[in-house]
Amino acid sequence: MKKKLSYMITIMLAFTLSLALGLFFNSAHADSLPQKNGANQKTTKVTVSNKDVPDAVRKLAEEQYLSRVALLDKASNHKATSYTLGEPFKIYKFNKESDGNYYYPVLNKKGDVVYVVTISPNPSNSKASKQQNNYSINVSPFLSKILNQYKNQKITILTNTKGYFALTEDGKVTLVLKTPRNNEKTYENATESTKPKDLNDFKQTASVTKPTLEYQSTRNEMYAEYVNQLKNFRIRETQGYNSWCAGYTMSALLNATYNTNRYNAESVMRYLHPNLRGHDFQFTGLTSNEMLRFGRSQGRNTQYLNRMTSYNEVDQLTTNNQGIAVLGKRVESSDGIHAGHAMAVAGNAKVNNGQKVILIWNPWDNGLMTQDAHSNIIPVSNGDHYEWYASIYGY
């Protein structure tokens, strides 16, 4: 009898142990199980050093991404659809340090990345930081095409002065997005190498094309209450390896207000600097006086304003079919490439939480971005910040 009882106890203990081990391994490997949802079967896995995201960053992304996406959809005449956020990821320098920002892909119902939310720490000396707004948000198509190209692959996204790179598991580094540079001399003296150091210590990945269910919307729940933009604004070109941001800006604005396609950045720069050749021409910029002069030469009464234009001013000028050029200076550093930058105002809007925003086109990007109308600090796609210190309006 004792032998039978001992045998039964042994069997029960073995069963309990096997059950516990099974639960443990199922839990431990849950992330590696294949997804049943077809949209998730091919996911882009981006390498990250850790997945720690501050609560303030999560809250900002959750609360503001959908209204800004709805606005960009409307401004670009995209059909409204439901969206969700993918897993947050980071971008690294070649020394393996993060660029300091947090990135969330915005996915449509098919699982494609349509936009990217960039959340960056505000500079300590900025107006937003002094108001205890520790982070700023920007939504644009930045890197969306790149992430879609690497579906079902594991990559590390790297950046330096030359642009953005994808490092694949076979060790191949590919330049996927070029960053414009302001002058050839600075570029040649850049010390960053495009040969990455050992990145094997990056143990975790973010499945950026895998929806985060807690942020998923069953429909386009947010909408833009009011959108006012230059009727014929189109993005026909983006800035390459040159210093022609002002040329791109004025071309886009004049093409919009004249409803034409005859302006382009190179022809504008050639008109203003006819005697320059080669590298001197490619890496020349424009002064505010030259921008004023060109606008007036094209029949526009362009005017200089020594500050950011207000929301109401943008609204009135846009309604009157008058373009505005943003003159910005980089907050992080006044030296080197991208120290000064021009951008175009495409319009203004109110989203359904009552927030006033200004639609801006950065010549580096292939889409518009949303700027808080109460802040003169513009966070651009790569995480830098520009102080909107002056405007030229009337294009």
Curated annotation (Swiss-Prot):
Active site (UniProt): C245, H341, N362
Gene3D superfamilies: Cysteine proteinases (3.90.70.10), Staphopain proregion domain (3.10.500.10)
Name recorded for this polypeptide: Extracellular cysteine protease
N-terminal signal peptide: 1-30
EC numbers for this chain: 3.4.22.-
Gene Ontology cellular-component annotations: extracellular region
Sites marked Cleavage: E221, M222
Alphabetical keyword list: Cell wall, Hydrolase, Protease, Secreted, Signal, Thiol protease, Virulence, Zymogen
Post-translational modification comment from the UniProt entry: Proteolytically cleaved.
UniProt keyword Glycosyltransferase present: no
PROSITE patterns membership: THIOL_PROTEASE_HIS
Gene Ontology biological process terms in this record: proteolysis
Subcellular location: Secreted, Cell wall; Secreted
An annotated Gene Ontology molecular function: cysteine-type peptidase activity
Species per Swiss-Prot/TrEMBL record: Staphylococcus epidermidis (strain ATCC 35984 / DSM 28319 / BCRC 17069 / CCUG 31568 / BM 3577 / RP62A)
Family indicated by similarity: Belongs to the peptidase C47 family.
Keyword Secreted: yes
Propeptide: 31-221
Stated role: Cysteine protease able to cleave elastin, insulin, myoglobin, fibronectin, fibrinogen, HMW-kininogen, alpha-1-protease inhibitor and alpha-1-antitrypsin. Along with other extracellular proteases may contribute to the colonization and infection of human tissues.
Enzyme class: hydrolase
